[in-house]
């Protein structure tokens, strides 16, 4: 056999991997130049136009081929050409056998495709050529071969130096794996493993500090007996007043503080009253005031001015005290009560003072304002001066205002009766008592000796100064109040608070909760966050809202930065509602009687044990049951011992017990728990559901730049408030003990922000000593001269141009005034100027009338 013929057969029997067989479409015979159309030599293209075959059986193609050989793709009518040595070709009935060259084999095997009208329809030449190229690529590669280009898997290992031989061996091994077909079976366990890796819980539950065990000493709390068996008719009050107390206020028996205070005050003695929160101190001074004023021989006239002055620290407490006095005065219509507080119109308050107010209830700041600016206010007939929540008045920095008020009262009225009331006795209250009270009687329900005190006795019990600070002081707590504490890492504070709110207010009936924060910015941030994520205003949840939102959730906010009308509306709405969550600052921590409050949550720890007592005192009032929860960080766990030193006993609630409520809501399910029931849960599912809730918060915060900036400002406010703890608590609450990245997580931020001080820094204008001189000496063309350098003429197109402001009245300019009308005034430059003319106004009015 000739060598050239042997090589031809060898190439035909063993095509190389890189050989590309030519696919020739019907009617496009490939001929070399100079060859006859019917024949050819080696290397020439054989025409593939078929001879009309003999009639074939129905359902068979004239080009049906059956090929046996290794690999998938062999079979009747197969259009795939396996790599390797092709098997012998078998001719089907009614078909024509050509030369077994790769080109002819491919052309014959494509007959089934050509007969399909869907595959090959009449197309433009360009589209047909693209289809032919696609067919080439389809038949060229094996069905099992992976794509030629693959992404290299990202490796997190350090680079390793390899030799040339190792590189070649690696390439050969990869090539064998690439070209060897391998069948992959996907099992259910692999799918679960992939879904399990989709949920990431490391950001919340990793790198957290260890939660310490609380070694709280068991202390015996100071208890007060709230109610007594004594009735109001035993005090010798007016019958109409007793009837009003029984019917309107629905009270028949007195509390302990009322039983001891009312007789002393009816005798005309000054008193310092100290009692626990919710014990009825407001009625303890309101009843004697009303009884003494209605019993005066000369009937009180409205124009007489104030006979009683009551000072309260907050506006909400002023409204509450005014409402109580107004109810007691229903039988005595000639006595007129009134209230003065910030946020109201001064003009209307001056009009009421001009008409006359007999019982005046006011905040210190607004009263000082009227003393300095209103001539119609006078205290010549004043008989009563009451300081309600005296410790809070001093805490808010009203010492100077109290001094101004006392000087104004002492200048017009020397003889009066003074009363101080507070739940805690501090050093500031003692100083105020020394200044304002005259031979006072100390009334404390904690002291058992007060029962033996006879009000008719002329002996006066002097006020004993309390210990320095609150270190050795003890506080009375209602017996029906249960106190709890939980230690939560900083990253989980937000999720833990949301889970606790859902647990109490969504899955339980008629729950009313008050959550205390340390600043107004924190209240606003959490209010908007919970309102948009936990609560759905409509039936279908909006974007970013959880579908599990229930109508039982009702969020309200109250802080000092709100308008007075809104504060009053929120206070009234929360007082009359059966359920809801009130997010507030310490503005609601003193004296407010919020009925049916079941839970008090302190998201930020109070600055003193006295503040802690006033916060939890919003629940369990007048014998009702209530509970409180204090949320602490692991570094703040020692605060429990500080509370125990003041005889405050708290019990611990585990963080896992709070987060497990998320398993009761199906909207917090992760991917791997989609088919499982909620009752069979474990710690991993609780973590994943907490991560889902945290993701909802973070998505809401990062949905816009404004919300991210808002969260950063709230974080800055938290840090500033954290730095204001007193020196006695600095070893527990110190800024250096905070992890800013973890704390930022509790505000929905994914990273710890930088330059927090730049967020609230106000831009200050540069101070120029002589601005007029600067304007005169400034050249008009100074900017153009600066732009021109020694290498440029200043005429290039890329030089920045000064943006001219549009003239008034033009699009983009400021609105045109009525007195400014365009009047043509051509000077040297022949430019249109603006001139004030009365004629222009008249012409404009005439034109508008014509239109």
UniProtKB/Swiss-Prot annotation:
Q: A Gene Ontology MF term for this entry?
A: ATP binding
Q: In which tissues is it expressed?
A: Weakly or undetectably expressed in normal organs. Up-regulated in renal cell carcinoma.
Which UniProt key words apply to this protein? ATP-binding, Helicase, Hydrolase, Isomerase, Methylation, Nucleotide-binding, Nucleus, RNA-binding
Q: Name one GO cellular component term.
A: nucleus
Which reaction does this enzyme catalyse, per its entry?
Answer: ATP + H2O = ADP + phosphate + H(+)
Q: Where is the signal peptide?
A: none
The keyword Ribonucleoprotein is assigned to this record? no
Segments forming domain Helicase ATP-binding? 262-443
Residues bearing the modification Omega-N-methylarginine? 828
Q: What is its EC number?
A: 5.6.2.-, 3.6.4.13
Q: What is its main location?
A: nucleus
| Disordered: region residues | 1-196, 762-784, 804-851
User: A single GO BP annotation from the record?
Assistant: ribosome biogenesis
Which PROSITE patterns does the annotation name? DEAD_ATP_HELICASE, HELICASE_ATP_BIND_1, HELICASE_CTER, Q_MOTIF
Q: Biased-composition ranges for Basic and acidic residues?
A: 841-851
For this chain the motif Q motif maps to 230-259
Looking at the record, the residues that make up the Helicase C-terminal domain are 480-659
The keyword Transferase is annotated on this UniProt entry: no
Subcellular compartments: Nucleus, Nucleolus
Q: How does it assemble?
A: Interacts with NPM1; this interaction prevents interaction between NPM1 and HDM2.
Q: What does this protein do?
A: May have DNA helicase activity and RNA helicase activity. Probably have ssDNA and RNA dependent ATPase activity. Plays a role in ribosome biogenesis and TP53/p53 regulation through its interaction with NPM1.
Tell me what this protein is called: ATP-dependent DNA helicase DDX31
| Organism encoding this protein | Homo sapiens (Human)
């Amino acid at each position: 056999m000739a060598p050239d013929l042997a090589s031809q057969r060898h190439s035909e029997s063993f095509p190389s991997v890189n050989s590309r067989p030519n696919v020739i479409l019907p009617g496009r015979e490939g001929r070399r130049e100079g060859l006859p159309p019917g024949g050819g030599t080696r290397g020439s293209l054989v025409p593939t136009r078929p001879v009309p075959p003999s009639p074939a059986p129905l359902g068979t193609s004239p080009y049906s081929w059956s090929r046996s050989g290794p690999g998938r793709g062999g079979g009747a009518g197969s259009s795939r050409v396996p790599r390797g040595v092709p098997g012998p070709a078998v001719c089907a009935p009614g078909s024509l056998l050509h030369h077994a060259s790769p080109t002819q084999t491919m052309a014959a095997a494509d007959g089934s495709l050509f007969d399909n009208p869907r595959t090959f329809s009449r197309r433009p030449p360009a589209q047909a050529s693209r289809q032919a190229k696609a067919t080439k690529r389809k038949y060229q590669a094996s069905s099992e071969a992976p794509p030629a280009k693959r992404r290299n898997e990202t490796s997190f290992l350090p680079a390793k130096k390899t030799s040339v031989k190792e590189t070649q061996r690696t390439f050969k091994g990869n090539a064998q794996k690439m070209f060897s077909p391998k069948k992959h079976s996907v099992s259910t366990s692999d799918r679960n493993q992939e879904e399990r890796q989709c949920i990431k819980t490391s950001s919340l539950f990793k790198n957290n500090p260890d939660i310490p065990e609380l070694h709280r000493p068991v202390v015996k709390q100071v208890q007060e007996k709230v109610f007594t068996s004594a009735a109001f008719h035993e005090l010798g009050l007016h019958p109409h007043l007793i009837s009003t107390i029984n019917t309107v206020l629905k009270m028949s028996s007195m509390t302990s503080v009322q039983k001891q205070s009312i007789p002393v005050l009816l005798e005309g003695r000054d008193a310092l009253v100290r009692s626990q929160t919710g014990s009825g101190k407001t009625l303890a001074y309101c009843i004697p005031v009303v009884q003494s004023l209605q019993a005066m021989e000369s009937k009180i006239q409205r124009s007489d001015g104030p006979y009683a002055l009551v000072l309260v620290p907050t506006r909400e407490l002023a409204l509450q005290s005014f409402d109580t006095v107004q109810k007691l005065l229903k039988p005595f219509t000639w006595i007129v009560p009134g209230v003065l507080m910030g946020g109201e119109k001064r003009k209307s308050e001056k009009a009421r003072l001009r008409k006359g107010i007999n019982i005046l209830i006011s905040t210190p700041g607004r009263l000082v304002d009227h003393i300095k600016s209103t001539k119609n206010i006078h205290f010549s007939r004043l008989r009563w001066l009451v300081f309600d929540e005296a410790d809070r008045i001093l805490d808010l920095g009203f010492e100077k205002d109290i001094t101004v008020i006392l000087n104004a009262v002492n200048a017009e009225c020397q003889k009066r009766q003074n009363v101080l009331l507070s739940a805690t006795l501090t050093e500031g209250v003692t100083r105020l008592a020394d200044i304002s009270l005259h031979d006072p009687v100390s009334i404390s329900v904690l002291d058992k000796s007060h029962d033996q005190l006879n009000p008719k006795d002329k002996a006066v019990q002097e006020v004993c100064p309390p210990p320095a600070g609150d270190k050795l002081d003890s506080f009375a707590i209602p017996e029906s109040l249960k106190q709890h504490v939980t230690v939560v890492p900083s990253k989980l504070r937000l999720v833990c608070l949301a889970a606790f709110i859902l647990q109490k207010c969504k899955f339980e009936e008629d729950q009313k909760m008050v959550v205390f924060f340390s600043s107004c910015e924190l209240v606003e941030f959490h209010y908007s966050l919970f309102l948009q994520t936990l609560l759905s205003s409509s039936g279908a949840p909006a974007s970013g809202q959880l579908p599990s939102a229930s109508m039982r959730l009702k969020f309200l906010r109250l802080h000092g930065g709100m308008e007075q009308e809104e504060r009053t509306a929120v206070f009234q709405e929360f007082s009359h509602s059966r359920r809801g969550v009130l997010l507030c600052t310490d503005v609601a921590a003193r004296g407010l009687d919020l009925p049916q409050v079941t839970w008090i949550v302190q998201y930020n720890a109070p600055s003193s044990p006295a503040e802690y007592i006033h916060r939890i005192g919003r629940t369990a009032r007048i014998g009702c049951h209530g509970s409180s929860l204090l949320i602490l960080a692991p570094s703040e766990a020692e605060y429990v011992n500080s509370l125990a030193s003041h005889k405050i006993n708290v019990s611990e609630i585990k963080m896992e017990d709070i987060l497990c409520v998320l398993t009761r809501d199906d909207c917090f399910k992760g991917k791997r728990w989609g088919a499982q029931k909620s009752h069979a849960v474990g710690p991993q599912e609780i973590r994943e559901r907490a991560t889902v809730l945290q993701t909802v918060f973070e998505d809401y915060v990062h949905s816009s730049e404004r919300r991210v900036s808002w969260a950063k400002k709230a974080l800055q406010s938290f840090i500033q408030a954290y730095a204001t703890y007193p020196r006695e608590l600095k070893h527990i609450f110190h800024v250096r003990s905070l992890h800013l990245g973890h704390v930022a997580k509790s505000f929905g931020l994914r990273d710890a922000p930088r330059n927090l001080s730049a967020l609230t820094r106000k831009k200050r204008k540069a101070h120029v000593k002589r601005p007029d001189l600067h304007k005169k000496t400034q050249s008009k063309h100074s900017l153009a001269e600066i732009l021109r350098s020694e290498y440029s003429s200043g005429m290039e197109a890329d030089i920045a141009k000064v943006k001219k402001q549009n003239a008034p009245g033009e699009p983009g300019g400021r609105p045109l005034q009525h007195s400014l009308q365009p009047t043509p005034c051509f000077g040297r430059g022949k430019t249109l100027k603006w001139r004030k003319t009365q004629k222009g106004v008249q012409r404009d009015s005439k034109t508008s009338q014509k239109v």
